[in-house]
Amino acid sequence: MPEGLQVFNDGGFVQIDANYLNMELKNRGSGVIPPSNMAAGGAQSSSITFTVNGENPAIAVISERMAACYLVSRRGSSFTFAIYNGENANNSVEWFQFDNSNNDGAGDSGLQVFNGVGRLVFDSNKKYLRVLDYWERGTGNLETRGYPGKRVAVIMCDYGYRFVVQNSPVDPSSPNYKFLQSQLDCARTTNDSLSIELTATWTNAFAPYHGEQNVVEGPSRWLVVDVTNF
């Protein structure tokens, strides 16, 4: 085998050698997001924003209620993200920033692996991205997966959305007004499980609209990561 270290687990092994590449934990934070009432047609959409520095940050989120994390803006190496609260209740969230690993050691003891040009590719003192699962789903009802013994967070890789046009309950026979609703796949984590469900982000029960009833939708894509003891 190539020079390096093989780590065996129940799923096989990981080869740590000069070609090893992973993202490491760079930063973390937490917050409480006020309630949103968009599903009921209200005007309150609540989120928190935070800014991190990096090269290619990936944000993993733990959320006690349905939430979605997305990039708001980038200016050079500064990235601003938002976490949207998809429920009409306070939402406690944690976030973890993973990014490209650098050449700095993280301690005075442990195992370090360097490549042929002297770059540090693994340090046992660092916390690296640990992917448990990749989840791609078409928009639909609530789905839940369990990961026993793990504390899980989720990285939203691609939006899952649905835009619904239906006859208005205010006047079902009107050709000029419709019920409109936009929906977004949001995620909730509970210790060792992850749930994903479509959550309404905007509703108008009597909106000026001259089209037919219709549904436009796209799938969502997620990485489930293990943040146990992080």
Per-region residue spans from a language model:
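Short, solvent-exposed coil/turn segments at beta-strand boundaries
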Residues: 2, 54-55, 192
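Low-complexity "stalk/linker" and mucin-like segments enriched in Ser/Thr/Pro/Ala/Gly
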Residues: 66-76
